[in-house]
Amino acid sequence: MIERQRRTKILATLGPATDAPGVLDDLFRAGVNVVRLNFSHGDPSGQAKRAADVRAAAQRVGVEVGILADLPGPKIRIERFAEGKVQLKAGDRFDLVASVDAPAGDASQVGVSYLGLPQDVAPGDVLLLDDGLMQLQVVEVQGERIINTVLNDGVLSDRKGLNKQGGGLSLGALTERDKELIGIVARIGVDFIAVSFCRNAQDMNDARAIAQSHGCDAALVSKIERTEAIENLEEIVEASDVVMVARGDLGVEIGDAELPGLQKKIIKASLAQNKVVITATQMLQSMVESPIPTRAEVLDVANSVIDGTDAVMLSAETAAGAYPVKAVEAMARICLGAERQFQTDTDFNASPRNLQRADQAIAMATMFLSQHVGVRAIVAMTESGGTARYLSRFRAKAPIFAVTRHDGARRQMALMRDVFPISFDSRGLTPREAARGAIRLLVEAGQLQAGDRVVFTSGEHMETLGATNTLRLLEVGADGRACGLGEL
C-alpha cells in the first residue's frame, strides 16, 4: 500500500540559522515546500545568494521548492535611543517626534519613522509599540510632536514597531524601497512576492503592474495585517493570487481575541475565490529555543489545517532558531496528523453553480467522480497551474498530481494543498499519449501501482493555457500502462 503523503504545505523563513552548509538540504528532506526571504532583514545581495542556494539544494534533493520574497512594506518604527533602550513607567509623559531631525531618544521622547503620524492620530488614540508590549495614549498633537501618556511599565528599545489600535493609518502599502525591491526580486527569479500591509485591491494592482514592468510573473501574496485590509477583504482576495493570514501585526491592531474568528473568515474568503491561503506567525514559536513544540502550538497548527489553509509558515523558528530542522519535522507531523483525523468530502450542494470556465467545470466534475468512484489519484495536465488550483480548492481525499514542463508553474503549485507537481514534457504528444506517459512516470516513481483508478484531466489542444476540457477515468494496468481511455 502506498503511504499517505502530507497535503498541507510548509513555508520556512531563511536566516542565519539556515545558512550553514547542509541545512537547506535537511530542511527540504524534512518537508519544506516554499522558502521565505524576508527583505526586512539583510541586504539584497545576501538574499540573492540564499535564493541561488535554494535552487541548488532543491536540485540535489530532487524536490520542487518555491521562493517567496517578502517586501518590508511601510512598517512604522521608532528611531534609536542614545543608550539603546529606556525604562518607562505608567503615567509618564513620552513624546513621539515625527521629524528627520529628531534627536536620539531618551526617557522623555524618541523619533518615529513615519512623518505623517501626527496627521493620523488624535487625543484618546492608543499607540501600540513592540507588538503591544508598550502602550501609549495620545494626549495632544503639537505640530510634529505627539504628546502621550505611558499606560504600562516596561522597557522600550531601538527600532521597535508601532501600530495604532483599531487601525486607521493612511500610509500606502508600497514604499519607494518596496518598488525598488520588486525589480531586484524579479531579477533573482522568485516565485512569489508578498505585499506587506496592503489596504485594498489597488495596492495589489500597483504591485502587479510594477512586477509586470520588470517581466516578472511571480504570484502576488497579499498579507492581511491591517484593520483596513479586513474591511476590504473581498476585493483584496480578488486582486491576489495568494492570501496570507499575517497574525502578528493584525493581532496587535484588532486584539488577540478577534484573531481566531478572523483567521477562519480570511481562509473561507480565499477558498471561495479559488485563491491559495497561508497561515503565519508564531505557529511553533517556542521551538526557537525548545526542541519540541508546546501542546498549544500543536493545536494551533492542527486547527489551521482543519480551517482549510493551504500552507503553514515558520518564521523565527527556522530563520534564527536553535532547531530549524526539528521545527519543520514537527510541523509536518502535526499537519499529517490533523489531515488523517479531519479529512472531509466536498459538499457539492454548497459548491458554485454558475461556473463560467470549462476548466472550473472539469475540476468540479473531477472531484465529484473521485469521491463517488474511489480513485487513487487525480492527474492533471496543466500549463500555468490553474487547473491544479481549481482542483485543490475542493480538498480532495485523492492526491492531485499536477503535470507540467514549466519550472515556474511547478514551484508555484508547491504551495497548493493536495497538489504534488510533476515534471513532464508533453510537447508533440496527443492527449492519449500524454496520459500514458504521465501515468507510467507516476508508476515508476512509486506513486501508482497496478489496479489503481485514476481521474485524468487535460485539454484537447496540449500546451494551451486554460484549455482543460477533457476528463477520463483510467485504470493502471499490470504493465504500468493506462487502460480504459474512453472519454466519459
Show where each model-derived region lies.
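Non-catalytic helical/linker scaffolds that mediate oligomerization, partner binding
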Residues: 1-488
